[in-house]
Amino acid sequence: MIRLILIRHALTNDNKKGRLSGHINSCISEEGKLQINKITRYLSNENIDKVYTTPSTRTKDTVEKISKLKLLEIEEKEALREISFGDFEGRTFEEIKIKYPNEFEKMIKEGNNYRYPNGESLIDSYKRVAEEIDNIILENNSNLDTKTILICSHAGTIRNIITHLISGSYKYHWNFKIDNASITVLEIDGGFAVIDKMNFTDFI
């Protein structure tokens, strides 16, 4: 069995301003730094076997302390990145609505099929995340004992992982709320996934 601990990175300055930061870096805020300490304390008694993040500094910074505490190397996975917002990286939806009204209208109309200029659609991001999480599960699967895998990633990525593991599609993507520094836990046995914790933040 695999116990999958999914952590959304701690609060960033861009998060506070409502700015889209898919593939660009955004610094952890002062509040986020406190969240990191609380995440580390909460997970200190967990038996963690592997730690994965994305190349984004906000994910690596979030779990650096717990990784060192557990004497584990962080393994970066490019495919677990947030959706690429392309030309709209660093902007707010309000800015997009005002400066690019036609594109904003197209975004609303096309929904999950909408592809950001020079970026991705939700479906694009779902496909790469689904393939990567399947590979991670296959690499770490063991019939003999339970392995605990920690992944620190992004809200969109975590939604993609959950909807993929419970339904095999992206259709429930928007049904899950994923807060900054939240912990979601899934147990996967024989290809069947059960949600043990969902968007858990009581420790913060």
Describe each model-derived feature in a short phrase.
Residues M1-I5, K50:
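Extreme N-terminal starter segment of soluble prokaryotic enzymes
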Residues A10, A155, T201:
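Active-site metal-binding loops of divalent metal-dependent hydrolases
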Residues L11-T62, P117-V129:
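Loop-to-helix element that buttresses phosphate recognition and phosphoryl-transfer chemistry
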Residues I39-F104:
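Phosphate-coordination/substrate-recognition cap region in phosphate-metabolizing enzymes
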Residues K60, E131-V194:
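Active-site-adjacent alpha-helix immediately C-terminal to a catalytic or transition-state-stabilizing loop
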Residues E103-D124:
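Short glycine/proline- and acidic residue-enriched helix-loop micro-motifs
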Residues D196-I204:
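Short, solvent-exposed aromatic-acidic interface loops
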